[in-house]
Every structure is written in structure tokens, then in C-alpha cells.
UniProtKB/Swiss-Prot annotation:
Protein family (similarity comment): Belongs to the GTP cyclohydrolase I family.
HAMAP family found in the cross-reference section: FolE
Organism: Pelagibacter ubique (strain HTCC1062)
GO BP term, pick one: tetrahydrobiopterin biosynthetic process
EC number(s) reported in the record: 3.5.4.16
NCBIfam families assigned: folE, PRK09347.1-2, PRK09347.1-3
Pathway annotation from the record: Cofactor biosynthesis; 7,8-dihydroneopterin triphosphate biosynthesis; 7,8-dihydroneopterin triphosphate from GTP: step 1/1
Residues noted as binding Zn(2+) in the record, renumbered to the chain: 93, 96, 164
Short name of one Pfam family: GTP_cyclohydroI
Name recorded for this polypeptide: GTP cyclohydrolase 1
């Protein structure tokens, strides 16, 4: 299985550019916008934006594989799908850096071992907190789970609104995008895939 090319398995060195340098860059952007970064209301804005960006894009310093390292084998033979629905997604598109807001559904079929339920949501969060396309985000979550858990199958669905479509450009406020990615049994067996789709539609 070819993994999605990107920073999906790399931890970036965020210290190559200092916070101070990033703050100066935001001051330049404020000036370009026609603002005065020295006025009272904006004095702390560059520092606040840098702090916010560390939260928005914290996924560049996190490793999904490490999150999934701890698994549990005492599942008494459970071999059916595990589905976690309605995981909040907050990301930013890589084209306009506009917010992507929506919901993810994740399922996997364990191969003797399971992972803590919160870890599924954390993997979604790690890849969401990077500049993304929704298609790549969906694939990265699925591939990380499939590889790290050695699962029999993985399914990921994301339903999200892109503010690059709702607030600018075509400005279609009610438009949402749905992406699905299936691996293993979910891809090979349509009955398994359809069962998953029924689960998440309830």
C-alpha cells in the first residue's frame, strides 16, 4: 500500500523559524492589509496569532504512529468492526488557509488487538492540525490506522464545510464535502462497506 506523500510520517522542526521572526511576518501582513500594527488594538496581535497557529497546526509536531503504539489484546475474541462516529474535525485548507470544519467517522476491524477509543479521535486531530486537502486527510487517517494496528480493514468518512467555498470565491454557504476511504475488508467486501455506511447514517 502506497502511503500518501506528505508530512504524514515526519515530525517537522518548527525551531527553524523563531517565534519572533513569525511575529514580524504577521506585522508585515497587517501593514500589507492597510492596518497599523503599532496601534493599541494590534500591539499584541502578532504574538497572539503565532500562539494560535501553534494550536491550529500542532499536528506537524505529533506522530500518529506513537499515539497508536499501545494496543490491547484482551478482547475475548472480538473481531467485528469498531466504529467511532461524530468526531469533530477542525483543519485548514492548504490553498487559502481557510478553516475546514466538520465531522469524521472512523471504523476498523481488529486483527486480535484493539486500541483505546480516544486514540481514534487523536489520530484524526493530528492529521487535521496541518494544512490539508480533505481527500488527503481522509486517506492519511485511514492509512495510519491500517498500518499501525495491522487491522483487517479500515473505513474513514469526513463530512465538512470549507470556508474557502462558503466565505469567498463561489460563496455557497450550505455546501459541504463528503470523502470516504476504504482499506482491507471495507474495500474488498461491499456488504461490510454498506454495513459501515448504515452505521454512520443512523
Amino acid at each position: 500500500m502506497k502511503l500518501v506523500e506528505d508530512t504524514d510520517s515526519k515530525i517537522l522542526d518548527t525551531k527553524k523559524v523563531s517565534d519572533k521572526e513569525a511575529e514580524e511576518a504577521f506585522k508585515t501582513i497587517l501593514t500589507w492589509m492597510g492596518e497599523d500594527p503599532s496601534r493599541e488594538g494590534l500591539l499584541e496581535t502578532p504574538k497572539r496569532v503565532v500562539k494560535a497557529f501553534k494550536e491550529y497546526f500542532g499536528g506537524y509536531t505529533e506522530d500518529a504512529e506513537k499515539i497508536l503504539e499501545k494496543t490491547f489484546g484482551d478482547v475475548e475474541g472480538y473481531d467485528d468492526m469498531v466504529v467511532e462516529k461524530n468526531i469533530s474535525v477542525s483543519s485548514h485548507c492548504e490553498h487559502h488557509m481557510a478553516p475546514i470544519v466538520g465531522t469524521a467517522h472512523v471504523a476498523y476491524i481488529p486483527n486480535e488487538r484493539v486500541v483505546g477509543l480516544s486514540k481514534l479521535a487523536r489520530v484524526v486531530e493530528v492529521f487535521s492540525k496541518r494544512l490539508q486537502t480533505q481527500e488527503r486527510l481522509t486517506m492519511q487517517v485511514a492509512q495510519a490506522l491500517m498500518t499501525s494496528l495491522d487491522a483487517k480493514g479500515v473505513a474513514v468518512t469526513i463530512d465538512a464545510a470549507h470556508q474557502c467555498m462558503t466565505m469567498r470565491g463561489i460563496k455557497k454557504e450550505n455546501a459541504t464535502t463528503v470523502t470516504n476511504y476504504f482499506l482491507g475488508e471495507f474495500k474488498k467486501d461491499l456488504s461490510v462497506q454498506n454495513r459501515y455506511l448504515r452505521f454512520i447514517s443512523k
